[in-house]
Amino acid sequence: MNSTAKLPKIILASTSPFRKALLQKLRLPFITENPAIDETPYPHESVVDMVNRLSLAKAHAVAEKHPNAIIIASDQSATYQGQAVGKPHTYPNAVQQLNQFSGETIHFNTGLVVFDNRTQKTYQTLDVTKVTFRTLSETDIHNYLILEEPYQCAGSFKSEGLGITLFSKIEGKDPNALIGLPLIDLTSFLKQCDIQLPFL
């Protein structure tokens, strides 16, 4: 393909500015749409199962309105010692989270679904990224929270911003997955949908 006229409509099923910015790296024309699904976890559902289910549900919700489009959807959840990590919402809760994570490792599970509504084919994967925090002082934590205010972010940090200063190590296949969209796997899936990348 060498013309946008030949490209199918590509829709990112997300309102996240971070996912939008990541997808823009691929230099493909796309639009965004809010999947507007219920993201409540099921009773006794594992984090991995939830992430996979929600990624698929987001894709299908948007696909219903766009019969010939390619839908990209993602969901992410972090775990610490096997338990889901929530959003702190307040400064005291964020301090508590970061104190708990000091010197420890948390896992980010990022689900990705590409649904080709032309063929009804689904491409799905789960990326796991391990983030190890350095030993954090009270000053480290206070200064970071005042500067970045990550109170709506699971784990009380923004890895795409100043949060990177809190880490000693990141282990994973794709650094973009930690921010919310695994671009390496996404590129592979789009190629299977006959989208040439790099696209000119």
Curated annotation (Swiss-Prot):
Per UniProt, the enzyme's principal EC class comes to hydrolase
Annotated S-S bridges: none
Top-level taxon: Bacteria
Say if the entry is tagged with keyword Hydrolase: yes
Q: Which Pfam families match?
A: Maf
Localization of this protein = Cytoplasm
Function of the protein: Nucleoside triphosphate pyrophosphatase that hydrolyzes 7-methyl-GTP (m(7)GTP). May have a dual role in cell division arrest and in preventing the incorporation of modified nucleotides into cellular nucleic acids.
Identify this protein by name.
Answer: 7-methyl-GTP pyrophosphatase
Organism of this sequence: Hydrogenovibrio crunogenus (strain DSM 25203 / XCL-2)
